[in-house]
Amino acid sequence: MFTHLPLGLKMEVEDVTFSTGGNATNVAVTFARQGLQASYMWALGHDPASETILHAMDAEGVDTSAVVQDERYQSGYSVVLIATNGERTILNHRGYAGGKHPRLDYGAIHSADWIYPTSLGDGGLPLLRHIIDEAEKHKVKIMLNPAGPELAEPDKLKALLESVDVLCTNKEEMQLLVAGETLEELALHALHYVPVVIVSDGPNGVVATDGKTLVRAGMYEDIPVIDRTGAGDAFASGFLSQWSQGKSLKESIIFASANSTSVVTKIGAKDGILHRGVKLHEMPIHERPVNARDV
């Protein structure tokens, strides 16, 4: 492993892989591979990266009719440097998708059952508020896995949570929103804002609750990690792909964990995403009822 790249040298790398990324496209592929009607809504350019994203979505059966293309826009581009233990450094060019006011096809929200807003860039909380308002007007359910720009203003984010149906964060992110030291404390305290809460802590597992049942799960499998890119997207979208179809909290967490585990065994965020019908095995998991003292 290295901690810095020396200047003035040409360094050899073992392998190069090209793939599409971005939180929204990653989660859309999970939904599509689980047999759901998935649609990708965002603003892209006509640059090679944008066209590659569209082709990748089409190949996965993801509807791209809600994508707005503008010649002024340019998709982001990242170089991911992966160490032998699966940890990575990402060199990220954010691209441009309209800044704080991107051109989006908000009408695409109206016919959805669920939306999963993520990685809203410069639009931040105002754009998230607009998306949530559109969803509420048409009784569309919302799962939120907030990113850095949204978490940078936790008080404003909390004001939006009453409209969210499922909230998924890691432990450090949830501690920006509610008090608590353990995963259980954080998840239970977040029930004051959201009806379904998921809090993860990497190899230490995950806690999820719907206010009636609390599930604590460990790792699905203890396997060598090739690349952690997309693991969080795979977990959150894996959960929703099952929960939205009426599966139990326990079943949804098992699939989410399996999906995330599969993704980290491959290079890139999409190759390891599970397909419909895959056989899953049991995992370390504990389930108990939530009582009044908990909340």
What is the meaning of each model-derived region?
Residues 1-43, 48-55, 59, 290-295:
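Glycine-rich phosphate/adenosyl-contacting loop at the front of the ribokinase-like
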Residues 151, 183-295:
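Conserved phosphate-binding/catalytic region of the ribokinase-like
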Residues 114-188, 204-206:
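Conserved beta-alpha-beta core of the PfkB/ribokinase-like small-molecule kinase fold
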Residues 32, 58, 136, 161, ...:
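Anion (oxyanion) recognition and catalysis
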Residues 65, 69-70, 80-122:
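Conserved phosphate-binding/catalytic loop of the ribokinase/pfkB sugar-kinase fold
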Residues 56-73:
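A glycine-rich helix N-cap at a beta->alpha junction
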